[in-house]
Amino acid sequence: MIGQRITIEICRASTSELVTVDAWRTATPGVVVHESPGGIWWAATHQRSGTVIATFEDPYSAMAFAAAIGEFDWTRSGAALVADPAVERCVIRRKRELGALVTVFNGGPERARRLSI
């Protein structure tokens, strides 16, 4: 993988469980790439909140997605990013272009607490 390896805590959208994973920094500050806990897919994740933005079949597509959404300041809180309609439009467009597996930038009950981080 390209980028510095770090450890982050992510919030599983299906269960709101917090899980620690190894991740890699990307060219976009605030966005990291990691393998899913079950090893099924790769995700581009908002580092500050641990919220998955999009999932892909391979790490290279996830890295390309992270670079493609780099026009925004991903070091902001998750709440600020979710509230920005331009971010949402860009994320949806880039997911379609790069073949994301799942459309996410959410979470379960844990979301409200995590997004403020």
Give residue ranges: language-model regions.
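Glycine-centered tight beta-turn/hairpin loop motif at sheet-sheet or coil-to-beta transitions
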Residues: S14, T28, R48-G50
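Short aromatic-glycine-(Arg/Gly/Cys) micro-motifs in beta-strand/loop hairpins
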Residues: V33-T51
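Charged, amphipathic alpha-helical segments
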Residues: T26-V32
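Short intrinsically disordered terminal tails
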Residues: M1-I2, V102-I117
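A short, exposed loop/beta-hairpin motif centered on an aromatic-Gly-Thr core
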Residues: Q47-S61
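Negatively charged, low-complexity tracts enriched in Asp/Glu with abundant Ser/Thr
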Residues: M1-T26
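Intrinsically disordered, low-complexity acidic regions enriched in Pro/Ser/Thr
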Residues: E35-W41, R94, N106-E110
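Non-catalytic tandem-repeat scaffold regions and their flanking low-complexity/translocation tails
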Residues: G30, A62, E71-L98, F105
